[in-house]
């Protein structure tokens, strides 16, 4: 009986330990961090241009909500073939960043071959493995869905006809300024107006107000859209043409200041964030001529690569400018 009792006790303890482990594991997965975590490189898929050229698409997941990490091109931020430098970022923004850059697929590359991006941050090394498997092929509808403009598996003739916006920087591609000195750059954006901004009609707003009059919980959501519960389990993104400037490559630890503050190019889903992934966010107006000036200053000397992104909420176009900063 004593042996049976001990066995029962150990079985119960084992079951409790298993439940506790599951609880701790689930809790750990739900934790969020401002800093100290590593970055996972991500292979997003591959696409084929109209001329038949194939490209691998990459992004990353910075597990921090605030920390931006710099990793120079080399053994800790490099590729397995074709040279370590394939145009990847050296400055990594917080959280999820999708379809950040693409790498031309070598003409001799076969479906069984792999291109590996290795990234080491905070002492942890992770790799992304790119292949030409057919199930990894990506088109514009997939991009719009993955970034949050569409629900999974949804599309329309309008969405399928969407053309990515374009951006042109009205300055020479290489400039030299001093630390702390302001540089003004002007971007010009153009878009086809697709997808259309979701603006509630007057009739729908009136119906919503009538329902809210009889429902205190709904009334609170009308007063504060940030209190609205999520309508989807995947990331959601507001559509509407907007422009974002951000640092793509630069000296480690350097800070770049943009005036006015820029719309975030990374998936900041927190309420009140200046981000198309944030609840109740709306795109700021674009001037009729599509031109937007920005003042930029730098904290450290060195060579910087800045990106300017024109984003319609579903697709985007990037343009880069290189700035040399001296003391």
Regions found by a protein language model. Give the residues of each.
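Bacterial N-terminal signal peptides
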Residues: 11-23
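Short, compositionally biased P/S/T/A/G/V-rich stretches that sit at domain boundaries
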Residues: 39-43, 135-178, 184-186, 190-197, ...
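Residue-level recognition of secondary-structure-to-loop junctions
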Residues: 48, 109, 286, 296-300
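Contiguous beta-strand segments within globular domains
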Residues: 50-59, 174-230
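Exoplasmic/lumenal beta-rich domain surfaces
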Residues: 79, 198-297
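Short, solvent-exposed loop/turn segments at the edges of extracellular beta-sandwich modules
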Residues: 311-315
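C-terminal edge beta-strand
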Residues: 317-325
């Amino acid at each position: 009986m004593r042996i049976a009792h001990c066995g029962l006790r150990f079985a119960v303890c084992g079951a409790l330990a298993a439940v506790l482990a599951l609880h701790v594991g689930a809790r750990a997965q739900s934790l969020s961090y401002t800093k100290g975590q590593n970055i996972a490189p991500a292979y997003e898929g591959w696409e084929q241009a109209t001329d038949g050229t194939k490209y691998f698409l990459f992004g990353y997941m910075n597990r921090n909500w605030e920390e931006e990490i710099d990793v120079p091109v080399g053994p800790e931020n490099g590729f397995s073939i074709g040279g370590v430098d394939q145009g990847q970022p050296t400055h990594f923004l917080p959280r999820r960043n999708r379809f950040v850059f693409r790498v031309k697929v070598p003409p001799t590359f076969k479906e069984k071959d792999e291109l590996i991006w290795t990234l080491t941050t905070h002492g942890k090394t992770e790799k992304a493995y790119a292949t030409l498997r057919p199930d990894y092929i990506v088109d514009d509808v997939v991009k719009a869905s993955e970034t949050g403009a569409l629900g999974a598996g949804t599309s329309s003739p309008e969405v399928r006809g969407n053309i990515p916006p374009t951006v042109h920087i009205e300055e020479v591609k290489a400039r030299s300024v001093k630390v702390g000195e302001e540089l003004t750059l002007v971007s010009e954006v153009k878009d086809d107006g697709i997808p259309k901004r979701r603006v509630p009609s007057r009739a729908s707003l009136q119906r919503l107000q009538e329902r809210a009059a009889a429902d205190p919980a709904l009334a609170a959501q009308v007063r504060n859209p940030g209190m609205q519960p999520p309508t989807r389990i995947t990331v959601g993104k507001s559509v509407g043409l907007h422009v974002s400037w951000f640092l793509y490559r630069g000296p480690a630890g350097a800070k770049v200041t943009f005036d006015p503050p820029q719309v975030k190019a990374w998936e900041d889903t927190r309420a009140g964030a200046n981000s198309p992934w944030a609840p109740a966010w709306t795109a700021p107006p674009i001037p009729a001529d599509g031109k937007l000036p920005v003042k930029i200053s730098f904290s450290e000397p060195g060579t910087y690569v800045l990106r300017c992104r024109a984003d319609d909420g579903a697709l985007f176009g990037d343009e880069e400018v290189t700035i040399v900063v001296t003391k």
